[in-house]
Amino acid sequence: MVVLKGVPALLSPELLFALARMGHGDEIVLADVNFPSSSICRGGPEEIRADGLGIPQLLEAVLQLLPLDTYVQSPAMVMELVPSDRKSGLLTPVWTSYQSILSRAGYEFSLGMGRFAFYERAKKAFAVVATGETALYGNLILKKGVLAPKDLC
């Protein structure tokens, strides 16, 4: 836990350090409990543990500090349902939460990345945050944007 003015207390020092080191276009994965975080991070992105935290609450905290990329169509991406889950009508209410949180922060939200494409993209991410999110298809990739000089302290 971090106890600093203006910094959400649920953001760990490791996560804050990763967010600070990311550059424009770098991506971070907020991963649910079923995501193969350790496997994806073997030889690739940094793995950051955030066990016990849900992705919606973590997303709200991260967006207080991390600007998302406004130069791309969607700086936030989820994994599409696999055909069998789509056919069975599996619901993904967590996506509605993401959409609401991102919209309040002024960002667009995109669906449309297949499972294996998502895994390959995650391997190229700056970091993967392994959370306690239990919602199916809860994984979310965020692309860092830029801060204008007037927004820098």
UniProtKB/Swiss-Prot annotation:
Position of the signal peptide: none
Q: Which UniProt keywords apply?
A: Isomerase
Pathway annotation: Carbohydrate metabolism; L-fucose metabolism
Annotated EC: 5.1.3.29
Gene Ontology MF annotations = fucose binding; L-fucose mutarotase activity; racemase and epimerase activity, acting on carbohydrates and derivatives
Output the GO biological process annotations, alphabetical, semicolon-separated. Answer: fucose metabolic process; fucosylation
Keyword Transport listed? The answer is no
Q: Report the active site residues.
A: H24 (proton donor), D69, Y119
Against InterPro entries, the record matches this protein to: RbsD-like_sf, RbsD/FucU_mutarotase, RbsD_FucU
The residues listed in the UniProt record as binding substrate, with positions renumbered to this chain, are: D32, M79, Y119, Y137, N139
**Catalyses which reaction(s):** alpha-L-fucose = beta-L-fucose
* Pfam families recorded: RbsD_FucU
Which family, according to UniProt? Belongs to the RbsD / FucU family.
Q: How does it assemble?
A: Mainly homodimer, but also exists as homotetramer, homooctamer, and homodecamer. The homodimeric form seems catalytically inactive.
What PANTHER family does its record include? FUCOSE MUTAROTASE
General function of this protein: Involved in the interconversion between alpha- and beta-L-fucoses. L-Fucose (6-deoxy-L-galactose) exists as alpha-L-fucose (29.5%) and beta-L-fucose (70.5%), the beta-form is metabolized through the salvage pathway. GDP-L-fucose formed either by the de novo or salvage pathways is transported into the endoplasmic reticulum, where it serves as a substrate for N- and O-glycosylations by fucosyltransferases. Fucosylated structures expressed on cell surfaces or secreted in biological fluids are believed to play a critical role in cell-cell adhesion and recognition processes.
Q: What is this protein called?
A: Fucose mutarotase
Q: Which organism is it from?
A: Bos taurus
Gene of origin?
FUOM
